[in-house]
Amino acid sequence: MIDKSAVIHPSSIIEEGAVIGANVRIGPFCVIGSHVEIGEGTDIKSHVVINGHTRIGRDNQIYQFASIGEVNQDLKYRGEPTQVIIGDRNLIRESVTIHRGTTQGGNITKIGNDNLLMINTHVAHDCIIGDRCIIANNGTLGGHVTLGDYVIIGGMSAVHQFCQIGSHVMVGGCSGVAQDVPPFVIAQGNHATPYGLNIEGLKRRGFAKEDLHAIRNAYKILYRNGKTLEEAREEIAQLAADNNNQYVKIFSDFLENSAKSNRGIIR
């Protein structure tokens, strides 16, 4: 179904069954598959291929040569009808690739709202990206990677499969992230290690002084007091319970969740 207000260049191919919302613009030489849904106001430039079971929200901008919903690169994939789900107001720049999920990873690759994926970003199968994240040019997320909200991944950086990146993390350019990165932390290098807290980013987002102080205390327990990871995890959990700070609770919950994975935490 194509809304009558949509503007589609005659050279583009829209397969039967695709759903094209109101005021969508599709430029020249695009291919939109039969199981694709594109939300109202989304602007697709030119030479874009969107296929598979892909649902895209409203007011997104998708630039030339992007490929969304393509068969993933997991050798176990056997053509199951897995999905890509993209939210609203995302900016997806030239040559970005976003692959569909796998049955082993929950069937979905999911991107939230208001994200910027710069040129040549790769989002592999089963990745989950929150809101207001930025992945700079040539950034790569391996399969099953999770990004919280407000994450920044520097240019030419790669995140190993199954890693979790907490909210408000900044990963420096040309880094290789092979372990989980707790919220609010700056990570840099190959392999990436902690370089303090993303204080400037938190200030720009309006974090109060008392919240920054509480986050610093949690960071010091994890990284500067010579404790084992298990000791630090327990002490931060107690700190979260004692001071009732929402951000320390986020920090503590991340550490608890990370304990269930096999990647470990950057140290």
Swiss-Prot record:
Family annotation (Pfam families): Acetyltransf_11, Hexapep
Keywords: Acyltransferase, Cytoplasm, Lipid A biosynthesis, Lipid biosynthesis, Lipid metabolism, Repeat, Transferase
SUPFAM superfamilies attached to this UniProt entry: Trimeric LpxA-like enzymes (SSF51161)
EC number(s) from the headed UniProt entry: 2.3.1.129
Catalysed conversion reaction: a (3R)-hydroxyacyl-[ACP] + UDP-N-acetyl-alpha-D-glucosamine = a UDP-3-O-[(3R)-3-hydroxyacyl]-N-acetyl-alpha-D-glucosamine + holo-[ACP]
Annotated compartments: Cytoplasm
CDD domains per the UniProt record, alphabetical: LbH_UDP-GlcNAc_AT (cd03351)
GO CC list: cytoplasm; membrane
Gene Ontology biological-process entries: lipid A biosynthetic process
UniProt subunit comment: Homotrimer.
Function: Involved in the biosynthesis of lipid A, a phosphorylated glycolipid that anchors the lipopolysaccharide to the outer membrane of the cell.
HAMAP family named in the record: LpxA
Name under which the protein is recorded: Acyl-[acyl-carrier-protein]--UDP-N-acetylglucosamine O-acyltransferase
Organism in which the protein naturally occurs: Proteus mirabilis (strain HI4320)
